[in-house]
Curated annotation (Swiss-Prot):
Lineage: Bacteria, Bacillati, Mycoplasmatota, Mycoplasmoidales, Mycoplasmoidaceae
Subunit structure: Part of the 50S ribosomal subunit. Forms a bridge to the 30S subunit in the 70S ribosome.
GO BP terms: cytoplasmic translation
InterPro entries: NA-bd_OB-fold (IPR012340), Rib_uL2_dom2 (IPR014722), Ribosomal_uL2 (IPR002171), Ribosomal_uL2_bac/org-type (IPR005880), Ribosomal_uL2_C (IPR022669), Ribosomal_uL2_CS (IPR022671), Ribosomal_uL2_dom3 (IPR014726), Ribosomal_uL2_RNA-bd_dom (IPR022666)
Name listed for the protein in its UniProt record: Large ribosomal subunit protein uL2
Entry keywords, A to Z: Ribonucleoprotein, Ribosomal protein, RNA-binding, rRNA-binding
Listed Pfam families: Ribosomal_L2, Ribosomal_L2_C
Amino acid sequence: MAIKKIISRSNSGIHNATVIDFKKLLTNSKPEKSLLVTLKKHAGRNNQGKITVRHHGGRHKRKYRLIDFKRYHYDNLKATVKSIEYDPNRSCFISLLHYQNGVKTYIISPDGIKVGDQVYSSDHAIDIKLGYCMPLAFIPEGTQVHNIELNPKGGGKIARSAGSYARILGQDETGKYIILQLISGETRKFLKECRATVGVVSNLDHNLVVIGKAGRSRHKGIRPTVRGSAMNPNDHPHGGGEGRSPVGRDAPRTPWGKRHMGVKTRNMKKHSTNLIIRNRKGEQY
């Protein structure tokens, strides 16, 4: 396991904090400059300066790494893994690939891949090896995949965070779709032309990390979350009252007055509803 505790005799605030030991997992190399772009801070504000996402702001400066989620620009060309690197913009690690034609790209790093390994992408059937990318139609049942496309050539959208994957269950009765079970428990159909990459996303211990103190959250750009009952009545439906007061409504509310907790918010008229067989709670769609 790559988790280790932070030991400090002078600071009790980080008594339970844990970190991932990157020295065991990553290569000691700097990011590829040609694949870095400036990432502007928005602090949860839109172009009018209004807060559209609460609890954002004040993070450490970052550079964005250009990730190849599509994997079809360099089909049928072998690529070698040159380094496995940390990415501050996502929970998983990223791998730097050097293609035979000299092109360099970053991809999401599958768990277990090593420097010197070769990966391949194609629009036809190829070997089922770690990091290989191909259409779902050519991947056998039971295989764990990640970086799955929702639309053909649209780039991977599903199963991209640390430790995530989907399992291929088989083909549907029409032959147009492949059925996958996502890590959430949802069972869903994908067009068989959609691509996926073989393997599980790296950094499996990410969910075991204990932040331990407020400063680490602020370093990541996460601001405090204030309870609605601690606010004034003009700031939140739960606000106001003398001392600690109850909600005073028939149900808890969001800051905008809508019902909160246990309310279904999905629009059932979405086209993708027809592709969901069972939701993550196991309910038939």
